[in-house]
């Protein structure tokens, strides 16, 4: 039976000017991931990257640690949703990151404050009631990721394994598909 490993990128640079890059911790995580996969003698017949910088950096560290020199194929179907647009649609003032930062700092616990805002923004996006406010609706995002998995599965031979470097949202969409869950 073929296998698809969905690998979430290492820690991104939350709070920096460019979120779409790994932090120092994220780079270390990518190497540890590769070492773990190598130790388990994980097969890697097909390598896929979602196309974001954090995906590529995770793949580079992981594959180097595994002793693999091949470059992953880029597949935009495994890209993450646009979390910045999702937050801006929820509250247009969040287009200015300083406004978002000020909002979450008011909570006293910035991580929990951000999580609360993010959950509300994600619920709004997933509701389907405001699809015109987004470049990609939740349903379109799920359809895109499902297409990526379906196409990838069709390419794999009977005992082949694919490593897919992606993000948590895409992985969640695959879980949603496999479990037959509703949009909410």
Where are the language model's segments positioned?
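Hydrophobic alpha-helical packing residues
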Residues: 33, 37, 121, 148-152
């Amino acid at each position: 039976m073929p296998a698809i490993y969905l690998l979430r990128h290492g820690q991104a640079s939350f709070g920096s000017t460019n979120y779409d890059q790994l932090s120092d911790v994220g780079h270390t995580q990518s190497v540890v991931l590769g070492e773990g996969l190598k130790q388990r003698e994980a097969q890697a017949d097909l390598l896929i990257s979602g196309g974001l910088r954090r995906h590529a950096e995770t793949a580079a560290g992981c594959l180097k640690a595994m002793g693999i020199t091949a470059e992953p194929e880029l597949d935009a179907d495994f890209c993450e949703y646009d979390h910045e647009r999702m937050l801006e649609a929820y509250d247009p003032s969040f287009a200015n990151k300083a406004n978002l930062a000020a909002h979450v700092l008011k909570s006293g616990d910035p991580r929990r404050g951000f999580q609360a805002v993010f959950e509300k923004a994600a619920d709004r996006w997933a509701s389907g009631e405001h699809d015109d406010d987004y470049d990609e609706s939740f349903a379109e995002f799920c359809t895109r990721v499902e297409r990526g998995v379906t196409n990838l599965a069709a390419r794999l031979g009977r005992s082949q394994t694919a490593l897919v470097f992606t993000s948590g949202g895409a992985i969640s969409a695959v879980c949603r598909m496999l479990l037959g869950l509703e949009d909410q």
